[in-house]
């Protein structure tokens, strides 16, 4: 079984403090994957995130928060199971998670263009000797189409760094939507697609 609860509150009406609490068993799901919070029956705080405006931009800080939480993206596909990703195949770039303490900022222009960036670290010291992760994204969305591109770098601490480039896009027809994505990975000088 699994039990999730999301708590949300605001102090000013323009901000949001969100806390996710999870509990569940460690048995395999019908798709053959274990739940991400295999901890028996105890309650675990899965994430604490605070979102607030900074001028015309939106800032997100938190623990166990995705860097991509402020990324616009351009993928309309939504899976009905947890085993199938919702990121059009760009989960390491446009759908990048965080490694612990995270800060992310985005700005949306009136023209449909948006910019976002973030940094995350598994330690309390961001940009130290730990395996920090940072990424930037640019996106454009109109009524019936959109495109987004992202760059993510994971310095992996003392190991060779890994970089990701991802692009995804969508086009909306009258009866259906088409979403596509492509991502590349370079790990210590070795390219993968």
PLM regions and their residue ranges:
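Beta-barrel outer-membrane channel/assembly domains of diderm bacteria
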Residues: 1-62, 66, 85-119, 130, ...
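Flexible, surface-exposed loop regions and adjacent strand-edge segments
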Residues: 24-26, 76-81
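Outer-membrane beta-barrel and related beta-rich outer-membrane complex signature
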Residues: 71-75
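Right-handed parallel beta-helix
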Residues: 121-123
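Active-site substrate-binding loop specific to GH73 endo-beta-N-acetylglucosaminidase modules
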Residues: 133
